[in-house]
Regions:
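Short, small/polar-rich loop/turn modules that mediate ligand/substrate recognition or access, typified
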Residues: 176, 181, 237-239
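Short C-terminal tail/terminal secondary-structure segment
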Residues: 96, 209, 227, 238-253
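Alpha-helical segment proximal to the catalytic Tyr-Lys
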Residues: 127, 173-174, 235
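Substrate-binding pocket helix/loop in short-chain dehydrogenase/reductase
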Residues: 96-99, 103-108, 207
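Conserved glycine-rich cofactor-binding loop
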Residues: 12-13
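Conserved glycine-rich Rossmann-like NAD(P)H-binding loop of the short-chain dehydrogenase/reductase
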Residues: 26-43
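Catalytic loop of short-chain dehydrogenase/reductase
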Residues: 91-92, 135-177, 189-190
Length: 253
């Protein structure tokens, strides 16, 4: 019997790579994408293969909606199946600053990747799953604590993630009668290349009590949630939101 296949976007490093390792450990072969191809791709492939997975990289820009059908077809051609989709690729605000100064170009870029691209790629995957009927399908969206927390210096990022959260809920309702669960994982402050530039800021805020757990999150924390949700042990759950944030989103006085 062939292993189930997971397609993970934005997985050559960071959270996506950690998710790939976790799903490889759980018995999946890994199809992974990113917008760039560099030494990190080979490193990621080695990590996935070390867990017994077949791994294949597909260079892909999630914002290029016209290329989505080709990507999914290429994954099917390479592996013969597609069982799980993890929408992880995303970008931050190109320039942080006053939201009254956000340009149309900056706003559109973030929306094209984080919302529009992610939504339409999940649409393509869902269509294929409805035809193929994999035994244990699932779709997971990696969003952000910024679905609930406002950052006025990167408002377009917050809007994009909140929009994707609503898309995940709508897709969960649409696919529930078809037996395809849809989940959302909301990372909090996670140690990645994207957050490296603001590490000093959040080191100080964490020390001041911003996060009840008292530490940064790691990519492996997010990956553990994705692996659990897609394990097949939550057969009556869909539309579920899991916060992986050390308690950041808990309202406190």
């Amino acid at each position: 019997m062939t292993r189930p296949v997971a397609l993970i976007t934005g997985a050559r490093r960071g959270i996506g790579r950690a998710i790939g390792v976790a799903l490889a450990k759980a018995g999946h072969d890994i199809a992974f994408t990113d917008i760039a191809e560099d030494e990190a791709v080979a490193e990621a492939s080695k990590l996935f293969e070390a867990e017994g997975a077949q791994a294949r990289f597909f260079r892909h820009d999630v914002a290029a909606v016209a290329s989505h059908a080709g990507l999914v077809a290429d994954v099917k051609a390479a592996f013969g199946r597609l069982d799980l989709f993890v929408s992880n690729a995303g970008i931050g605000a190109p320039i942080r600053g006053d939201m009254l100064e956000i340009t149309e170009e900056s706003f559109d870029l973030v929306m094209d990747v984080n919302l529009r691209g992610a939504a339409f790629l999940s649409q393509e995957v869902a269509r294929v799953m409805l035809v193929d009927r994999p035994q244990r399908p699932a779709i997971v969206f990696v969003t952000s604590a910024s679905t609930e927390l406002v950052s006025i210096d990167r408002a377009q990022y917050c809007v994009s993630k909140l929009g994707l959260s609503m898309w995940a809920k709508a897709l969960a309702v649409r696919l529930a009668p078809e037996g395809i669960p849809v989940f959302e994982v909301r990372p909090g402050i996670i140690r990645t290349d994207m957050t490296a530039k603001v590490a000093a800021k959040y080191d100080a805020r964490i020390a001041d009590g911003l996060i009840p757990a008292g530490r940064w999150g790691e990519g492996e924390d997010v990956a553990a949630a994705v692996a659990a949700l897609t394990s097949g042990q939550f057969a009556y759950a869909t539309g579920t939101v899991v916060n992986v944030d050390g308690g950041l989103l808990i309202p406190r006085l």
